[in-house]
Design a protein with these regions (language model features):
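C-terminal accessory/tail domains of diverse enzymes
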Residues: 1-169
Length: 169
């Protein structure tokens, strides 16, 4: 949310973070999960898939739209007319969606945010496949709101190879 610079008021009302208990229940379900089973967990036992304004739609990843219309909706992006930022947001949504479709297995583990959020997020983007010069602007737009050095996890003077260079100066 920090990388996307989501307004805190929007997070509280329109694009809440994931419901952890629901996610844990889904993770414990059988490997070959059907859409009906997923729907049962998403709506917590009730079927609100025909209701346009279900309370479950106000999450960053809105699966209500999958059950209601057959489309996936990402609600975490702020409005903008900047073409580069629009491209970055679309590319991020497509990359995460593609990984979800193509990934053979998942491990439910939160990636800790290190003292250098820019480096942590950059490695996440690289794991998504946003590598190379064609994604340079996408990475730049997505990381512009994060503090830290995107190239080094820790202060670069801490690495032995860089200490040697500092001593030569």
């Amino acid at each position: 949310f920090k990388a996307l610079k989501v307004n805190e008021n929007r997070v509280q009302r329109w694009c809440q973070k994931v419901r952890e208990p629901m996610l844990e229940k889904i993770r414990k379900m059988p490997t070959h999960l059907t859409m009906e089973q997923l729907k049962q967990q998403w709506y917590e036992g009730t079927d609100e898939s025909r209701m346009h304004y279900s309370w479950t739609r106000y999450y960053a990843l809105n699966l209500h739209s999958v059950f209601y219309r057959g489309t996936l909706e990402w609600r975490c992006f702020e409005s903008t007319l900047h073409a580069g930022k629009v491209r970055a947001n679309i590319t991020l949504a497509l990359a995460i969606s593609a990984q979800a479709i193509n990934q053979k297995k998942t491990v439910m583990r939160k990636t800790g945010i290190s003292e250098n959020p820019a480096f942590t997020f950059r490695t996440f983007l690289l794991r998504l496949g946003l590598i190379g010069p064609e994604y340079k602007n996408v990475r730049a737009h997505l990381m512009e709101n994060l503090p830290g050095d995107k190239a080094w996890r820790y202060d670069k003077t801490m690495y032995p190879s860089n200490q040697h260079r500092e001593n030569e100066r």
